[in-house]
Amino acid sequence: MSKVLFVFGTRPEAIKMAPLVIEFKNNPAIEVKVCVTGQHREMLDQVLDFFEIEPDYDLNIMKQKQSLGSITCSILTRLDEILASFMPAHIFVHGDTTTTFAASLAAFYQNIKVWHIEAGLRTWNMNSPFPEEGNRQLTSKLAFFHAAPTLQAKDNLLRESVKEKNIIVTGNTVIDALLIGIKKITGSTGDVREIISLKNKLNLDKKIILVTLHRRENQGELLRTICDDIKQLALEHDDIEIVFPVHMSPRIREVVNEKLSGVVNIKLVEPLAYPGFIWLMNNAHFILSDSGGVQEEAPSLQKPVLVARDTTERPEVIENGAAMLVDPRIPNNIYSSCKKLLSDERLYEKMSQAGNPFGDGKASKKILDYFVSLEDIK
């Protein structure tokens, strides 16, 4: 029996790994264990509960004002013991977090094969996003197998001399998770209390604009500028309702609350659990976000995305027209881009009908099928 360890620590990782964990656990020939680092404690636990995944190991590493170096050291030290005890033949990591890189390095040191899910995303700028671009490039150097979500991601890996035989194009597992999630909330098997609360708070006769912001490069004075644009849009359009789940980071919460509290058609809410968030995405007119996951999910729901960044490691969604880059460093760019999408029906229709370049919801099965087909795993 082949031993496999899944390691993740943040809410986005958990969402994207959940369908893969479920798929692997349904195969009796594979012994599956799950290790969470707790890099995003509360938001991570919500996702685990929703997908009914109980971790076998919980490193619970998070402390107040912890540096990236401290997080990395904690994961390396704690995971070293788990790998020595469980002795998996393969470790699965996802994306570009500090957990991703640290877990890959720990596995590399014990000669354990690293499987990198959502591999090959690149901006080619180590400072944007930081530290994610560095994390994913370093992880690619340590990985044995690369599950690239798109052909573009595969090409990026080939440019870095990754062997083609070690790459498979699978689509993105976030679409698998989204389809599971929509089915759960539609069938009322998920936690619907949050959805009921949202319905009571919002005026669904208005156009709902969902806003999410969390990246380091959008904090500080730039976040103040973005909030000014959002406020101006809200004050000029009484036919819209802006819903902003505010990230737990004190640096974000302080600015957002100062700038946007008290505006009647701006609803500042606590971070949403996964079922509430996908319900809100599904009911939004469009989305303003710096989130990578939102860029991947929203096209499946036919929701245009304005990406509040100057670049993206997901160029496919820009190229196919489902999303648009809106550089927040350009004065009034957020405001004018939102205003245009509200008024230009042809643009809205084109973006909402562009389709999803990130797959069909079968990525997890493709990864499992490839895994069991390898000679040394049977």
From Swiss-Prot:
The keyword Calcium does not apply. Pathway: Bacterial outer membrane biogenesis; LPS O-antigen biosynthesis. CDD domains: GTB_UDP-GlcNAc_2-Epimerase. Its EC number is 5.1.3.14. Keywords: Isomerase, Lipopolysaccharide biosynthesis, Plasmid. InterPro entries: UDP_GlcNAc_Epimerase_2_dom (IPR003331), WecB-like (IPR029767). It comes from the Bacteria. The active site is at H214. One of its GO terms (molecular function) is UDP-N-acetylglucosamine 2-epimerase activity. GO terms for biological process: O antigen biosynthetic process. It catalyses: UDP-N-acetyl-alpha-D-glucosamine = UDP-N-acetyl-alpha-D-mannosamine. Belongs to the UDP-N-acetylglucosamine 2-epimerase family. This is UDP-N-acetylglucosamine 2-epimerase.
